[in-house]
Amino acid sequence: MARVKRGVIARARHKKVLKAAKGYYGARSRVYRVAFQAVIKAGQYAYRDRRQRKRQFRQLWIARINAATRQNGLSYSKFINGLKKASVEIDRKILADIAVFDKVAFTALVEKAKSAL
């Protein structure tokens, strides 16, 4: 059986890592050992932040809904409680969109929540 030298495989692996590290600053985009660590860390950040993104968007929606409900003389928690009692099943993402882009419809929802309390 012929001897296989690993130069081709190592070169391919190095190229793959350096391609992933393209755009990084300094040695992180040029030196394999540093680039490899940077790519691993970037993957960890990406994994963590894919989960955090969901939390952050929910926080943003709640902040927007809260601001809009307070303009209509109601707190966020009472508004959500009123909607549940009025059996209005609109999620926070849609409520935030309505609060930003359709003030009249949002005011109607606030009135409906107030009447259900």
Swiss-Prot record:
GO biological process, one term: translation
Keyword set includes Ribonucleoprotein: yes
InterPro entries documented for this protein: Ribosomal_bL20, RIBOSOMAL_L20_CS, Ribosomal_protein_bL20_C
Record GO cellular component, one term: ribosome
PROSITE patterns referenced in this protein's UniProt entry, alphabetically: RIBOSOMAL_L20 (PS00937)
Chain segments annotated as coiled-coil in the UniProt record: none
Keywords attached to this entry: Ribonucleoprotein, Ribosomal protein, RNA-binding, rRNA-binding
Pfam family of the protein (one): Ribosomal_L20
A GO MF term: rRNA binding
PANTHER family found in the cross-reference section: 39S RIBOSOMAL PROTEIN L20
Function noted in UniProt: Binds directly to 23S ribosomal RNA and is necessary for the in vitro assembly process of the 50S ribosomal subunit. It is not involved in the protein synthesizing functions of that subunit.
HAMAP family: Ribosomal_bL20
NCBIfam families for the chain: rplT_bact (TIGR01032)
Protein name: Large ribosomal subunit protein bL20
Source organism per UniProt: Histophilus somni (strain 2336)
Source lineage: Bacteria, Pseudomonadati, Pseudomonadota, Gammaproteobacteria, Pasteurellales
Gene name, Swiss-Prot/TrEMBL: rplT
